[in-house]
């Protein structure tokens, strides 16, 4: 419901805020949902458990000016030294602006660029009013965080350009428990002519004079999520994606931290775009020493026409503040996403250990061999069997990556009676031969793609993305279907509905193996993503009991947009245990480990050629919310350790899904990385400790734990008992007998 600004008088009377003039106000203390947003005239305070975000509207210019984003402040705050209106053009670099427009003397990177009918890009968006909403409205057609009154409060600030009749509504949703402010923007054309949006940031924030470091995630296929940290220098630095999806190259996340900030100490500001398409993230340190940070649409991929009365809504950006280092920032993202982003029923429920057929057999299988693989999997204790690529295609059978995409009917040579008999056979298998539980069945699809060698492409070549008469560039022998077209969306929804109704399918792995080329317009990327989101929204709502996993050649779409619909994502096509330590640690900067798909694969590894002990590979895979095997199960039938490792993965899983992650030692800083998962109530914990290279005459260092109750006693692996204070201030030490050593240690509070 809407709360009118009349509530401000009541808040002032209660002493929650006091107008002090010139853009100053006192900040609410002891924040609850009722005072997460406090307003006094045109002064605004957004309050978290340990965070304050304060800004005001300049009474002369109507511009929104930032006062503070950081640790909680109280009492009156000093007014920023702003130039008089006549000095505006000469001194724009001194002003910390909330939503910087273009063309009026601020030469730093803008948050919005609007081309008017006459051709110019000048905007003058001034404060017009505001409203406060209990709860959080949904974003039309886009993934978004959610919450009820008491969980989240939303401030909407209305800006208006009197000359162009353009309105901008800035949304600030405050989740106090997580020190999170979620921002998005609506731009509406209220004039009579057409306008074009050429740039729109979901978030812009200006920081005062100080040194900052920029932390981000870079990579490529099979080496995603490498942590990058560099000093913010004068000028513009940034990154993004122009691939049509969030990409392996750069993740739509970054953090700003003080140079002295570590994993466990210091201030950190995290920013994560809830979006799966092309994006841009930029940070600029201006001549006056102020630092501006923005993230939103990639302007090179945006030219959005707005006719009279039409609106463009930006994706939202989640920003969190931490006074407990980068690790504290990550834990706030993780808790927020588990509770208020991932809408699946599986967000916090145990995931079944699975076996995926891909690296075990690739395209070489038939009904009989698949049934044998499933039987061998069930005997090991696997609870979900997944048939990957190669099961479909009639006239153009999918026996390699050269044909079949788009023709989503079972290959009659491999499955002469369709999927139902094989699925029935598999789902009648008993797990472990002693359990009453039956094996579940899952299947791989890549609905957004089409092979030219397919019946679908022969019938609808116009459904593939193309730019006029230019040649259509193939990648992995495939093209991209244009999901901006409603008929393509309906085709995918219909065949997926038929597939899921045809047999007892419990799991879908949704893949995407290439980016967008030959886009017909600069706005194709966003139109495409809106179509993808409509398909995701329809299917996940229609089949809520199906466990959906996202994939894009591994982690090419590991983003908060996909997580809104799918509770887990395949983290990387690289299943090498050593490489996965770095990839999974990096991914956890913004995304909860509960969302990571991680599998134990064969050796030598199919991507790196490296041979790593079975136990090490299994322990690394246990750190993902979806543990699985990616190999031929026949190679494991005589290994007694495998069923025990699967049982250990199931024991670990609840803590990985719902616990707080502490990265105790980083793989880029030490050859002995370590991580600890602690139950939210502190009753249990599990330590993962690795050795990444051989060491002669060098003992592994002690590892200090975090997040425990210092006054409580903890039993370590059911043996020795130590206080939380001892474990955190002294720690534990282990020795490793092999080049790639690993330990998984369970702790339980007494």
UniProtKB/Swiss-Prot annotation:
According to the UniProt record heading this chain, what is the dependence of activity on pH? Answer: Optimum pH is 3.5.
What molecular function terms (GO) are annotated for this protein? Answer: alpha-galactosidase activity
User: Is Hydrolase there in the keyword field?
Assistant: yes
Q: Could you name the domain of life of the organism this protein comes from?
A: Eukaryota
Chief localisation class: secreted
Q: Its GO biological process terms? A: glycosylation; mannan catabolic process
InterPro entries per UniProt: Aldolase_TIM (IPR013785), Alpga-gal_N_sf (IPR038417), Alpha-glycosidase_related (IPR050985), Glyco_hydro_36 (IPR002252), Glyco_hydro_36_C (IPR031705), Glyco_hydro_36_N (IPR031704), Glyco_hydro_b (IPR013780), Glycoside_hydrolase_SF (IPR017853)
Class of this enzyme: hydrolase
Recite the UniProt keywords alphabetically. Answer: Carbohydrate metabolism, Glycoprotein, Glycosidase, Hydrolase, Magnesium, NAD, Polysaccharide degradation, Secreted, Signal
Task: Give the record's GO CC terms.
Answer: extracellular region
Q: How does activity depend on temperature?
A: Optimum temperature is 52 degrees Celsius.
Catalytic site: 511, 573
* Names of the cofactor(s): Mg(2+); NAD(+)
Where is this gene product found? Secreted
Q: What's this protein's function? A: Hydrolyzes a variety of simple alpha-D-galactoside as well as more complex molecules such as oligosaccharides and polysaccharides. Active on paranitrophenyl-alpha-galactoside, raffinose, locust bean gum and gum guar.
How this chain assembles, per its entry, is: Homotetramer.
The entry sums up its family as follows: Belongs to the glycosyl hydrolase 36 family.
Kindly provide the name given to this protein in its UniProt entry: Alpha-galactosidase C
The record lists the organism as Emericella nidulans (strain FGSC A4 / ATCC 38163 / CBS 112.46 / NRRL 194 / M139) (Aspergillus nidulans)
């Amino acid at each position: 419901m809407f709360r009118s600004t009349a509530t401000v008088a009541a808040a002032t009377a209660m002493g929650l805020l006091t107008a002090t003039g010139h853009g100053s106000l006192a900040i609410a203390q002891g924040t609850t949902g009722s005072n997460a947003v406090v307003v006094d005239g045109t002064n605004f305070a957004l309050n978290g458990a340990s965070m304050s975000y304060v800004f005001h509207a300049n009474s002369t210019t109507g511009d929104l000016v930032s006062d503070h984003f950081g640790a909680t402040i109280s009492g009156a705050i000093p007014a920023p030294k702003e130039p008089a209106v006549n000095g505006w053009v000469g001194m724009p670099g001194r002003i910390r602006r909330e939503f910087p427009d273009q063309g009026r003397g601020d030469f730093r990177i803008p948050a919005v660029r609007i081309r008017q009918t006459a051709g110019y890009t000048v905007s003058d968006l001034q404060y017009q009013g505001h409203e406060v909403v209990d709860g959080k409205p949904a974003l039309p057609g886009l993934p978004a965080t959610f919450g009820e009154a008491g969980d989240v409060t939303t401030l909407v600030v209305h800006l208006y350009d009197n000359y162009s009749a353009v309105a901008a509504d800035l949304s600030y949703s405050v989740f106090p428990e997580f020190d999170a402010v979620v921002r998005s923007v609506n731009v509406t054309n209220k004039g009579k002519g057409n306008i074009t949006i050429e740039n729109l940031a979901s978030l812009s924030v200006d920081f005062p004079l100080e040194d900052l470091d920029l932390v981000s995630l870079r990579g490529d296929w099979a080496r995603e999520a490498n942590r990058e940290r560099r000093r913010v220098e004068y000028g513009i630095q940034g990154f993004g994606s122009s691939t049509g999806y969030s990409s392996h190259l750069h993740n739509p996340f970054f953090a700003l931290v003080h140079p002295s900030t570590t994993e466990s100490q210091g201030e950190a500001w995290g920013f994560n775009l809830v979006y799966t398409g092309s994006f841009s993230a930029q940070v600029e340190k201006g001549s006056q020493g102020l630092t501006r940070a923005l993230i939103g649409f990639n302007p090179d991929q945006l030219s959005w026409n707005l006719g009279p009365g039409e609106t463009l809504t930006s994706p939202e950006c989640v920003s969190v503040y931490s006074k407990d280092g980068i690790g504290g920032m990550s834990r706030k993202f993780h808790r927020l996403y588990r509770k208020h982003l991932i809408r699946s029923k599986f967000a916090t429920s145990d995931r079944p250990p699975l076996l995926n057929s891909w690296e075990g057999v690739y395209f070489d299988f038939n009904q009989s061999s698949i049934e044998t693989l499933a039987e061998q999997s069930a005997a090991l204790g696997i609870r979900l069997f997944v048939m990957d690529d190669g099961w479909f295609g009639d006239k153009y059978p999918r026996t390699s990556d050269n044909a079949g995409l788009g023709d989503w009917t079972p290959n009659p040579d491999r499955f002469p009676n369709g999927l139902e008999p094989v699925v029935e056979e598999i789902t009648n298998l008993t797990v472990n031969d002693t359990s009453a539980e039956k094996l579940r069945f899952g299947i791989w699809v890549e609905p957004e793609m089409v092979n030219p060698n397919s019946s679908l492409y022969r019938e609808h070549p116009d459904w593939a993305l193309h730019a006029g008469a230019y040649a259509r560039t193939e990648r992995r022998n495939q093209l991209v279907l244009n999901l901006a077209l409603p008929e393509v969306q309906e085709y995918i929804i219909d065949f997926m509905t038929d597939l899921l109704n045809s047999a007892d399918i419990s799991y879908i792995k949704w893949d995407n193996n290439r980016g967008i080329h030959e886009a017909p317009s600069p706005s194709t990327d966003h139109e495409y993503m809106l179509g993808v989101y409509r398909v995701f929204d329809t299917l996940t709502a229609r089949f809520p009991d199906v466990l959906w996993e996202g994939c894009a050649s591994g982690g090419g779409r590991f983003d908060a947009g996909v997580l809104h619909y799918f509770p887990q994502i395949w983290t990387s096509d690289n299943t090498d245990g050593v490489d996965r330590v770095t990839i999974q640690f990096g991914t956890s900067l913004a995304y909860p480990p509960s969302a990571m798909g991680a599998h134990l694969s064969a050796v030598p590894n199919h991507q790196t050629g490296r041979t790593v002990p079975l136990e090490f590979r299994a322990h690394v895979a246990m750190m993902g919310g979806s543990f699985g095997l990616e190999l031929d199960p026949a190679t494991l039938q005589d290994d007694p350790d495998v069923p025990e490792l699967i049982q250990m993965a199931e024991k670990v899983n609840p803590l990985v899904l719902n616990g707080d992650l502490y990265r105790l030692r980083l793989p880029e800083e030490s050859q002995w990385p370590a991580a600890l998962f602690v139950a939210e109530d502190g009753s249990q914990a599990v330590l993962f400790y690795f050795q990444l290279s051989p060491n002669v005459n060098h003992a592994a260092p002690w590892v200090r734990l975090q997040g425990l109750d210092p006054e409580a006693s903890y039993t370590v692996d059911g043996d020795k008992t130590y206080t939380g204070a001892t474990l955190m201030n002294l720690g534990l030490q282990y020795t490793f007998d092999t080049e790639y050593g690993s330990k998984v240690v369970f702790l339980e509070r007494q």
